[in-house]
Amino acid sequence: TGDSKGQHHFLDTSLYEKSILATWKKLNLPKLPLICLTQSHECNNKSSLIHMFKTLNGKYLINSSGEINFEKINSFFKHNNSPIVFAGTALAFLELIKNSSNINIELPNGSWVLETGGYKGMKKSVNKDTFYAEISELFNLPIDKIINEYSMTELSSQFYSFGLNHTHKSAHWLKAKVVIPGKNTEAQDGEKGILAIYDLANLGSSVAIMTGDIAIKKGNEFELVGRDETLTPRGCSLAAEELISRHI
C-alpha cells in the first residue's frame, strides 16, 4: 500500500476490534467517554481510525460532509461537565487551534486529549513540541495528559505514548525494531533508523510491515521521530485535512 491512502483487507474485523480493546485495557488507558473530532462510522466506514473510535464507543463532532461545526462543538462543551478523552487527528486539532477565536472549549478536570495521524499534511506541518504546547494552552491541559496513538491502516494493533519524549508502548503481540536503512541491521540503543513492525493480530495479511517512519531505539521500545521527509506523506491526518479543506 504505497499510496497516500492505504488498504488492509480483513476476513472480518473481529480480531482488529479485540486488539483495540485489549491494548486499551493492558495499557490502562483512560476509562472515560471518547469524544471524536472525526466523522461518524456511518458517514465514513472506510477509515481504520474511525472504526477504532467506533469500537471504543466514540461520539462524533464532525458532520457528514467533513466540516468542523464550531457551534456544535461549543454547544457540546458548554453542557458537558464530566471528564472525557477528546480524540482526533493532529491536523484536525490544528484547525481548532487556527480557529481558536471561534471556540470556547474548557475540558473538565481529569480529561485527556488523544491525537493521531501525524503532523505533516498537504498544506501544513508542525513541530510536535510546538503542537503539544498549543494543545496544552488551548485546552488548559498538562502536556502529560496528551496521548499519541501510533498505528496505520496496514496494522491491526496500536502503540501509545504519553506527553513528550516518551517511548511508545503496546501489547505483547505487537513488536517493533528500529532498522538501519540499507543495512538490514537493528539500530543500537539511542540510534535512529526506520521502524519495522511485527503485528501478530494481522491474521490473514502481512505480519511484518516496513514503515517509512523514523524512530530512536530505546531499549526494547522506541521513540517516534516522524516520517522520512523524502517519502510521500501518509496518515489519517491527510484524510482529515482533505475533508476540512473542502469547507475553507
Please provide the spans of the model-predicted regions.
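Hydrophobic packing residues within well-ordered alpha-helices of enzyme cores
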Residues: 20, 49, 96-100
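Conserved structural elements of the adenylate-forming
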Residues: 8-28
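Conserved adenylation A10 loop of the ANL superfamily
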Residues: 1-9
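Conserved Walker A/P-loop ATP-binding site and its immediately adjacent core
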Residues: 38-43
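Active-site glycine/GP-rich loop and adjacent strand/helix microenvironment
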Residues: 25, 29-33, 55-248
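Short phosphate-engaging motifs
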Residues: 16, 45, 92-95
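A general alpha-helical scaffold signature found inside nucleotide-binding enzyme cores
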Residues: 14-19, 51, 130-133
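Hydrophobic alpha-helical segments in the ANL/AMP-binding
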Residues: 45-57
